[in-house]
Amino acid sequence: MPVGEGSHHNKILGVRGEDLAAAYLERLRYRIIDRNFRCRGGEVDIVARDGKTLVFVEVKTRRTAGYGVPQLAVTPFKQRQISKAALAWLTRKGMLDVNARFDVIAITILSPDAPRIEHITNAFELAY
């Protein structure tokens, strides 16, 4: 594989996973508010509303189980990055007084026709 090609394929896989996750959430009647919010300290893949609760969603996608289950990639360090981005998002929107939670959607695409989606609600607490 040429240099850089792996990261390109990983980016495509990540976008595919985020699209699958957004569609999954919409089927559950979540309302997608924002996607791929980035700030200096981190990134949030999806910001959605589940009723009156604001949900910050981290999406992890894998093509194989060889690297372990996708949700294990949401390490304490990654949780801190997501938390920083969520606080930045809330601050910019003037929404620091809303109910919010952090979910993880783990997607394994062993076959293009049958991705496995696991949704973990309240996956972690706000981390500093």
UniProtKB/Swiss-Prot annotation:
- Sorted alphabetically, which PANTHER family does this protein's record hold? UPF0102 PROTEIN YRAN (PTHR34039:SF1)
Q: Hey, which family's this protein in?
A: Belongs to the UPF0102 family.
This chain's protein is named UPF0102 protein GSU0650
**A family per Pfam:** UPF0102
Q: Which GO terms describe its molecular function?
A: nucleic acid binding
Please tell me the species this chain comes from.
Geobacter sulfurreducens (strain ATCC 51573 / DSM 12127 / PCA)
Q: Which SUPFAM superfamilies match?
A: Restriction endonuclease-like
